[in-house]
Every structure is written in structure tokens, then in C-alpha cells.
């Protein structure tokens, strides 16, 4: 090893010395009068490798310690991200902070922060594990052959799993000062990145244009990220053709090339068992010959240990280890790097007089004007009101990012980016410009779940014109399973008027209902409902209010009771008016760490289309909050109540309590740990519950649950301590999965003291 190191030092010294001697200046006339030494250019080449590219930062840290500043940087994929930021002026410490603070699950997805999603989207989307937008124009498809229509629809599906919008806006926010179209030679360190032309398979060297977009193009992994269009070319990850672009660094004038290789070895045959492994292998094979050629041409070859990490290993522990491994690998070349620094002398690769990029998160700007491009002029005012931004005002970078997140939260746009450019008429001021790309307006979504009460179920959703700011939209939902249901809805969103919703509901239900501790009724019924309501006046993210009218129809197919009791099973219809309000500012639906969720609903049933009906009313309410006294511990208090007003009310509107899920068999069913299925209770009902949750591992949660129930014929009876209430307790384990929580609990209550129950579920509830 020592012999190899000495050999490397000798070769490096001879290379640099011979280069310097060869460049001793001659005058223009060929004489020796103009003796000058040409500056030796050092190139830094950073290859692709996904999360493994964090090791590049460790190498840069070592170069900074030695004092080597490259004259040119060339990167591919993640190497373009790290290299581009370094070229803009971010040092290794800042790069480490950026990587450590980044929410990679968010960046590598199409997600919008829950706080920025509209309330209606919260209600609808947190049921599905996959949603696929598409933009087929159904008018255009009308009249075509069936196979042509299907093909036209498929062409409008997205070209990648992730649109890359979140990554692009991260880069945009870090490139303030270099967001406009420029030559990358004007950066503090000249820079270039590599992409692949998807139409020809050719290598594309990106050394001018919109820097963040070029960096994003270079890391467009085929199938994962949507391709990027630049100058009429459809570009994907440069690693397909040139993952270690030493040759490009040479063309950019580099005399000495430091190459950092974080590419994994080719995958063994017995490990090619998954789709991602096959895709990565294909990409590696396509550019392998050029990779081997460039590897030989690197003067200083640095190979960090990335053997234990994958393309998506962006968790904090992995990033910390990769950074250390990068530093260690560079430190093993310490003698060579020190020798190179001595030969270079005081020459500095970076031009310290060139302005460094600003991080938008740490800056404020005097913005004289805000412009919008790519939207209907009539929507501009609406979006301005939504963002809360004001022209001729001091605006922070966080406010700009918040506005982008709000725009994305409408789901009307597949891409929202921004540009901060200097206002030439006002010294030190900026013009903020937002760019919008419309999203596919339609969506197909799929949800799936299993639980021990109803077995397996699937939810299918088709939204037509769903991802639009205003106008009409429709949706069709089918729940397939033991208790199937369907929902057909149409809504019209006005710009300056409450939203109008019209819904038709169908539901077939087979359920065991307990009328007391020992008596069970088996009921099977068909429900049809028609509802029209006005909803929020404007775009609300945490609040929703509705006012409407509803027609319910119940047809009982079976009503088996263990006690002799007359039950009228004829079809019955009820007309009601209702109002409801909901609020939800929790940071997560399934495992929140802060926030409050509440719902209040009042209904007046004024008509029953059968004899003996008397008008009655009902009031329902629930509230839950999350308090986190420690990092992994949460206390979740909850309250549920429902009161039927008037002594005589109808069977479908009794108070039903039981099970782990709210609203399973009837909309107003209240959950209670310790009672399986559902049971009937008196007119006035109150349930208090507290969950104690501990996050003992990354996605693993343990619960202790206690709930208490009181009921009475009237509110006074319910609150009276002349009779005792019911207690229920449970222990639960939950695991966060991509299709929803996996949960198992065991429970007991004094409603039925003889039995300990159990419940298993997987997936979001619907």
C-alpha cells in the first residue's frame, strides 16, 4: 500500500511539474520573452448514486481542510445536486446542514404538507394508498374506437412516480442570485452537469440555462422522477450514459481530476428480484463501459464505502455515516492531496469576489411586484388572497415557500416554481414571479383494508375535473367488500360564492346490533341517501362548514331479534335539514403529534313519509387533541357526545356505540374500545376517552387506551351520578405502512365482563 502511495505521489508530481514546464510562456512571436506559467486547473467529478452521494460532502470537507478549491465541478444525478450547491458557494458545513434538515420523504414524493391541503382534500385523500392523475379530454375521446380511447387515456398518465416539484423548489430556494438563465461559468466555481436525451439516448452537457432546473434534470431517475424538458429535449438522469464524467471535466479544461465514485457494484444475479433492482442494474449496465474508461482517467480516485446503503437511504443515521465514510475515503488520500496543494501553491480555484447564492429560508426580500405566469388572469387575485402575500412589502423566504405549498395544496398544478430577480428600477428590491403548470384534472385512486369485523375491502375512486381551481367536478366511489357502498357526487366551486355539493349515497349493511348486554339483533338493510349542501365560501385548510338538506331511505331486508319485540321493517324515508362544522389542524391523520380535530353536527328531521312520525332533532359532537410532553410520547384526550331531542325518534337514528372505528355502520356511530360491533344506548350519550401513545421505534407505536361511557334518557339523567357508567380498556400495537396503519388491540369492558376481545386492522378506514 505504501509503495502504491509513493508511486501515486511521484506520478502526480511529474504530471504537474511537466505541465508547468511545458507552459512556460513564449511571446506571441515564439520567443521566450513572455515567460509565464499557466494556472493548473483542478476538476472535481462527483458521480451519481442516490443517497450514497451524501458521501460527496465528506470528501469536500477534506478538500477544504487541505485547502484545495477546484476550478471546475462536473456532476451527475446526486453529484449534480451536491456539486451545483458547492459551485454556488455553499461549503461542506452548510451542505451537511441542508442534507440533515431536509425532509427526504417529502422531497421524494408529490406530497404537500398536511397543513397546506384544503379541508375537502383531507377528508377524501386520506383513504387511499395510491392516486394516479391523468388529463384525458373526454370530449376529444368521444367517438373514437375503444382501443384508441384507452390508448389516449394512458398517454395522459404521469411519466414518473414523482413529479420532482418538491426537489426543484428546494433547489430554487437555495439558488437565490442564480435562478435566472445564466452561463454556469459565472458561478463562484464553474459547473456542468450531465443528463440523457430520452429521445436519442445521447449525452447532454448542461452548462448554461436555469441552474436549478438543470440540476433537477440530471437526477431524473427514469420511472421515478418525471423527465424534464429543456430546449425541446426530454431529459432524464445523466447516469444512464455517463455517471462518472471525468471526460467532461477534461473538456472543461481540468488538468488534474479528483473523481469521487459512490456507485455500487453491479448487482449479483441472485439479488435481481425486485423492480427497483432491475431498473438500477439496467441503468448501470448502459453506462458501464464509459464509467470504466473515465475511472482510469481520474488522477485522484476516491471510493467511499457505500456498500451498506441504497439509493434511497436518506435517513439521518445513514446520511451521517455516509458523510463520515466520504471523509475517511478522502483522508486515505491525504498525502496525495497535500502534495497536490503544495504544487498548486496559493492559487485558489474559486473566485471569492463572485457573489455566493443565498438560502431563501434564511433571507428576507423587499418585493416590489408579484407576477403570475401560466394561470387564468381571473385566478390571479384568488391565488394572491390565498397566499397572503402583498406587493411592495418585505417578504421572507419562508413566506414564499409557504405560498408555493399552498398553491400545490390546491392540486390544480403539477408544478409551481418561482423566480426572484432584481428590480432594476429599485436598488436592492426584487420582483417575485410564480410559474404554474396545470395538473392533470382527473384522478384514479385506490384504497384497501382488512379488519376482523368486515374482512377485506377495497375503495375505488374516479374524480373528473377534480384537480381544478373552479367550476364543476364529479366523483364516483365504490367500496367493495362485505358491506358494499357507493357514492356519486357533483360539485360546483364558485370564485366568490359558497361551494355547491350534490351527493347520492348507496349502502348495504349487515350488522349485529346489541340492544343490551345479552340481547343481539342481526339486521340487514339497504340505505339510499340524497343530499344537497352549500359549503365553504373560500379555500379553507383547517375548517369546513356545510348547510344543507338530506333525504334518507332505509329498507330493512332482515331484522332478527333474540327478544320478542315488534319491529316495523317497511321502507321508511326521512327529510332533514342539517348544519355541520369541522376543524382539523393535526399534523398527521393516523399518528399526530400536535393539533386538534373537532366536528359538530345538528339535524332536524322534519318529515317522515310514513304514519306515526313525529319530528325530532339530534346533536352530535366530538373533539380530540394531541399533547406531546416528550419527543416520543403523546397523550390524546377525546370526547364524543350525541343527544336526540324529543322522546320519540326513529330506529335508524338511535345512539349506536362500539368498535374501533367511528361511523362504521351508521354515520353517527361512536367508537368505544371494549364493545365489539355496535350496541344501542339511550337518548343522551357521552363518551370520554384518552389514548397514551409511545413511539418506541421508527414506525412502531404502543397504546394504552381507557374510555368511559354515560347515557341517559335525558341530559340530566346522563350526567347524574345516581347510576354508574361503563368503563373500557385496551392495549394496542400499531405500525405505519404505506397503505395505512397496521393495528392490533386486545380490549375489555364492564359492558360484558366475561369476555376479552381482540381486533386487527390494516389500512386506512373507509
What residue spans do the PLM features occupy?
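Gram-negative/organellar outer-membrane beta-barrel architecture
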Residues: 398, 415-431, 435-586, 657-671, ...
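C-terminal outer-membrane beta-barrel translocator/porin domains of Gram-negative envelope proteins
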Residues: 443-446, 578-582, 586-697
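Patatin-like phospholipase
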Residues: 22-76, 84-405, 409-422, 439-440
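Short loop/turn motifs that connect adjacent beta-strands in outer-membrane beta-barrel proteins
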Residues: 467-473, 495-499, 539-544, 587-596, ...
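Flexible glycine-/small-residue-rich
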Residues: 195-197, 207, 304, 374-376, ...
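Bacterial Sec-dependent N-terminal signal peptides
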Residues: 1-29, 643
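Buried hydrophobic packing residues in well-ordered domains
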Residues: 49, 79, 95, 201, ...
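C-terminal hydrophobic structural anchor segments
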Residues: 693-727
Amino acid at each position: 500500500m505504501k509503495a502504491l502511495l509513493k508511486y501515486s505521489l511521484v506520478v502526480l508530481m511529474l504530471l504537474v511539474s511537466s505541465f508547468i514546464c511545458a507552459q512556460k510562456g513564449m511571446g506571441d512571436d515564439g520567443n521566450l520573452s513572455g515567460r509565464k506559467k499557466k494556472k493548473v486547473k483542478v476538476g472535481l467529478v462527483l458521480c451519481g448514486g442516490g443517497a450514497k452521494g451524501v458521501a460527496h460532502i465528506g470528501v469536500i470537507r477534506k478538500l477544504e481542510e487541505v485547502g484545495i478549491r477546484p476550478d471546475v465541478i462536473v456532476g451527475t444525478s446526486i453529484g449534480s445536486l451536491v456539486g451545483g450547491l458547492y459551485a454556488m458557494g455553499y461549503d461542506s458545513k452548510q451542505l451537511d446542514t441542508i442534507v440533515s434538515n431536509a425532509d427526504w420523504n417529502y422531497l421524494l414524493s408529490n406530497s404537500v404538507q398536511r397543513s397546506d391541503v384544503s379541508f375537502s382534500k383531507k377528508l377524501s385523500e386520506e383513504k387511499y394508498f395510491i392516486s394516479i392523475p391523468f388529463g384525458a379530454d373526454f370530449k376529444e375521446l368521444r367517438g373514437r374506437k375503444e382501443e384508441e380511447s384507452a390508448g389516449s387515456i394512458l398517454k395522459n398518465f404521469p411519466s414518473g412516480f414523482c413529479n420532482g416539484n418538491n426537489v426543484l423548489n428546494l433547489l430554487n430556494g437555495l439558488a437565490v442570485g442564480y435562478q435566472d438563465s445564466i452561463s454556469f461559468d459565472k458561478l463562484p466555481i464553474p459547473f456542468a452537469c450531465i443528463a440523457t436525451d430520452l429521445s436519442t439516448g445521447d449525452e447532454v452537457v448542461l452548462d448554461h440555462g436555469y441552474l436549478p432546473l438543470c440540476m433537477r434534470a440530471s437526477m431524473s431517475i427514469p420511472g421515478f422522477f418525471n423527465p424534464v424538458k429543456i430546449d425541446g429535449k426530454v431529459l432524464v438522469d445523466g447516469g444512464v450514459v455517463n455517471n462518472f464524467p471525468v471526460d467532461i471535466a477534461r473538456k472543461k479544461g481540468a488538468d488534474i481530476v479528483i473523481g469521487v465514485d459512490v456507485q455500487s457494484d453491479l448487482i449479483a444475479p441472485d439479488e435481481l428480484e425486485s423492480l427497483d433492482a432491475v431498473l438500477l442494474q439496467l441503468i448501470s449496465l448502459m453506462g458501464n463501459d464509459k464509467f470504466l474508461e473515465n475511472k482510469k482517467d481520474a488522477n485522484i480516485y476516491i471510493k467511499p464505502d457505500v456498500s451498506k446503503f441504497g439509493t434511497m437511504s436518506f435517513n439521518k443515521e445513514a446520511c451521517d455515516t455516509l458523510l463520515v465514510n466520504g471523509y475517511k475515503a478522502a483522508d486515505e488520500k491525504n498525502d496525495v492531496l497535500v502534495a497536490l496543494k503544495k504544487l498548486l501553491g496559493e492559487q485558489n480555484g474559486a473566485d471569492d469576489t463572485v457573489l455566493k447564492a443565498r438560502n431563501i429560508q434564511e433571507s428576507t426580500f423587499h418585493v416590489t411586484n408579484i407576477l403570475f405566469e401560466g394561470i387564468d388572469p381571473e385566478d390571479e387575485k384568488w391565488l394572491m388572497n390565498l397566499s397572503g402575500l402583498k406587493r411592495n412589502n418585505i417578504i421572507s423566504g419562508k413566506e414564499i415557500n409557504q405560498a408555493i405549498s399552498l398553491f400545490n395544496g390546491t392540486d390544480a398544478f403539477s408544478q409551481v416554481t418561482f423566480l426572484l430577480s432584481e428590480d432594476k428600477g429599485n436598488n436592492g428590491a426584487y420582483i417575485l414571479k410564480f410559474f404554474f403548470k396545470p395538473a392533470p384534472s382527473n384522478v384514479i385512486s385506490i384504497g384497501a383494508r382488512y379488519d376482523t369485523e368486515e374482512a377485506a375491502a377495497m375503495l375505488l375512486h374516479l374524480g373528473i375535473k377534480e384537480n381544478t381551481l373552479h367550476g364543476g367536478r364529479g366523483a364516483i366511489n365504490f367500496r367493495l367488500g362485505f358491506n358494499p357502498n357507493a357514492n356519486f357526487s357533483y360539485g360546483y366551486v364558485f370564485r366568490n360564492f359558497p361551494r355547491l355539493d350534490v351527493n347520492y349515497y348507496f349502502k348495504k349493511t349487515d350488522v349485529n346490533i346489541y340492544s343490551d348486554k345479552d340481547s343481539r339483533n342481526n339486521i340487514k338493510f339497504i340505505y339510499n341517501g340524497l343530499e344537497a349542501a352549500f359549503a365553504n365560501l373560500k379555500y379553507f385548510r383547517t375548517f369546513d362548514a356545510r348547510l344543507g338538506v338530506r333525504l334518507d331511505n332505509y329498507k330493512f331486508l332482515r331484522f332478527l331479534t333474540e327478544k320478542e319485540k315488534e319491529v316495523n321493517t317497511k321502507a321508511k324515508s326521512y327529510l332533514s335539514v342539517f348544519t355541520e362544522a369541522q376543524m382539523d389542524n393535526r399534523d398527521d391523520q393516523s399518528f399526530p403529534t400536535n393539533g386538534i380535530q373537532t366536528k359538530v353536527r345538528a339535524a332536524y328531521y322534519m318529515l317522515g313519509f310514513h304514519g306515526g312520525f313525529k319530528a325530532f332533532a339530534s346533536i352530535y359532537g366530538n373533539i380530540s387533541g394531541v399533547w406531546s410532553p416528550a419527543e416520543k410520547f403523546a397523550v390524546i384526550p377525546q370526547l364524543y357526545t350525541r343527544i336526540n331531542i324529543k322522546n320519540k325518534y326513529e330506529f335508524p337514528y338511535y345512539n349506536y356505540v362500539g368498535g374501533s372505528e367511528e361511523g362504521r355502520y351508521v354515520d353517527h356511530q361512536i367508537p368505544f374500545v371494549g364493545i365489539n360491533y355496535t350496541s344501542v344506548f339511550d337518548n343522551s350519550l357521552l363518551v370520554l376517552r384518552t389514548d397514551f401513545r409511545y413511539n418506541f421505534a421508527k414506525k412502531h407505536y404502543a397504546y394504552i387506551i381507557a374510555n368511559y361511557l354515560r347515557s341517559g334518557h335525558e341530559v340530566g339523567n346522563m350526567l347524574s351520578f345516581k347510576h354508574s357508567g361503563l368503563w373500557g380498556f385496551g392495549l394496542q400495537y400499531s405500525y405505519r405502512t404505506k397503505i395505512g396503519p397496521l393495528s392490533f388491540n386486545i380490549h375489555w369492558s364492564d359492558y360484558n365482563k366475561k369476555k376479552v376481545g381482540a381486533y386487527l386492522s390494516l389500512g386506512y378506514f373507509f
